[in-house]
């Protein structure tokens, strides 16, 4: 039986990204990536229920990320969709001929937090593309390994279900150039 995919966000599927109002929280902007330890660290995702902007940890946050599950695989343009090992490939396939940009990050990575608002802005600018985020925690380690991640953040650009470009580190200009190259090529 073919998998049926819903292409609109579920009203209960919103999660806030962990960007603090003070920026990188003490991380130097010179550092552009974090190494992923071999052991892998399972991270806890904080959820906001009433849109009040406070995570479980008590930190204020700024932007919103859509989260999906296999039951509600959501592909939308103009926003960032949080994926996991179970929903990534179905969403990439559902995107059809659209270019897919994937941000592979961790909750504890300072440079990932610094570039997250810029990544969100790109999703709003490039309405003809699908922007995804994958938390490279222990649960998603098999997919991260399959995609060949060594550092976070790593950005993968996919066309026709294949990786065509990769940018490692929080290098906004390089990411922008890779997106433009994928669009024109």
Curated annotation (Swiss-Prot):
Pfam families per the UniProt record, alphabetical: Thioredoxin
Disulfide bond entries: 109-112
Localization per Swiss-Prot or TrEMBL: Plastid, Chloroplast stroma
Cellular component annotations (GO), alphabetically ordered: chloroplast; chloroplast stroma; plastid
InterPro entries linked: Thioredoxin-like_sf (IPR036249), Thioredoxin_CS (IPR017937), Thioredoxin_domain (IPR013766)
Function: Probable thiol-disulfide oxidoreductase involved in the redox regulation of enzymes of both reductive pentose phosphate pathway (Calvin-Benson cycle) and oxidative pentose phosphate pathway.
Family: Belongs to the thioredoxin family. Plant F-type subfamily.
Protein name per the record: Thioredoxin F2, chloroplastic
């Amino acid at each position: 039986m073919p998998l049926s995919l819903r292409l609109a966000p579920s009203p209960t599927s919103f999660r806030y990204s962990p960007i603090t109002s003070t920026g990188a929280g003490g991380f130097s902007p010179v550092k552009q990536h974090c190494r992923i330890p071999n052991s892998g660290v399972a991270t806890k995702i904080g959820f906001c229920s009433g849109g009040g902007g406070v995570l479980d940890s008590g930190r204020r946050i700024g932007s919103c990320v859509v989260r999906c599950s296999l039951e509600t695989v959501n592909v939308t343009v103009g926003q960032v969709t949080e994926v996991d090992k179970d929903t990534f490939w179905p969403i990439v396939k559902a995107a059809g001929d659209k270019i897919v940009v994937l941000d592979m990050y961790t909750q504890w990575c300072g440079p990932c937090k610094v570039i997250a608002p810029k990544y969100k802005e790109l999703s709003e600018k490039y309405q003809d593309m699908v922007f995804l985020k994958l938390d490279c925690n222990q649960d998603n380690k098999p997919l991260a390994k399959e995609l060949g991640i060594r550092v976070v953040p790593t950005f993968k650009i996919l066309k026709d279900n294949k990786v065509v470009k990769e940018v490692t580190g929080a290098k906004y200009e390089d990411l922008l150039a890779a997106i433009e190259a994928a669009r024109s090529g």
